[in-house]
Amino acid sequence: MIWGSDSHNPSNNPAIAPPPGTHNASIYLVAGIAALGGLLVGYNTGVIAGAVLFIQKDFHLNPTQEEIAVSAGLMGAIIGALCVGPMNEALGRKRMLKILAVIFIAGSLATAVAPTYGFFLSCRIIVGFGFGATGSVVPVYLSEVAPANLRGRIVTFNQIAINFGIALSYWVNLAFAATGKGWRPMFAVAVIPSAVLFLGMFITPESPAWLASHGRWDAARRALERLGRKPVEIEQELNSIRWAGELKEKRAWRELLRPGLRLALVVAVGLAFFQQFIDPSP
């Protein structure tokens, strides 16, 4: 028997695979709330593009300082992306998104009232930590709450939200630039979706997979019920989660370097790197 073969995954067994179309509005509501994290990633990434012209005038920045102002958020994002993994596993997806929403609220407000250039940079690094971490947490959460037959569709909510957030930041920049109100309201606007994300996470369930991985099987069952799963689907998903946990224990990270997987790993990492390097975002 070869571990990892699709034939051993309960969700891939035709006899017990979830029937197509078995879902309701619950999963879309949860996905829509969580995708606000993606919107905040896009908005906080894009807003600096229009705001920096006004910031340069207010703080009398030279070209080097202007470049640092633009890149400060990305510096924080690198830190957030590197640090979020262990925190996400320890605290859970739902709690992490609440914490990140608070970071966005506080960071956006502080950025909007920044009295000095140095204070502004500090705030942008904090917000950058938030969107760097959120970019990792949201897709994991979406993939773990979605049923197998909808997983691809639900996970794309995050990328759609990121791009919409970038576009929204440009529209907001244009609106405030036209009214002559300057750069501060541009950053303050991010408080609104941040607050909605924070409040929305109180009505969403924790990831069933995360709960099960911490031995909280009854809580995982209740989470699946809240997500609208039928009793038979709940048993199927719990079996699939249990199977995945057993497989994880049998695998080691070094197996990614096996000849059969090495090329795929290099291609996947390379695509992710060059996607960001060439910046294809609008």
For every predicted segment, state its role.
Residues 1-282:
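Transmembrane-helix signature of 12-pass secondary carriers
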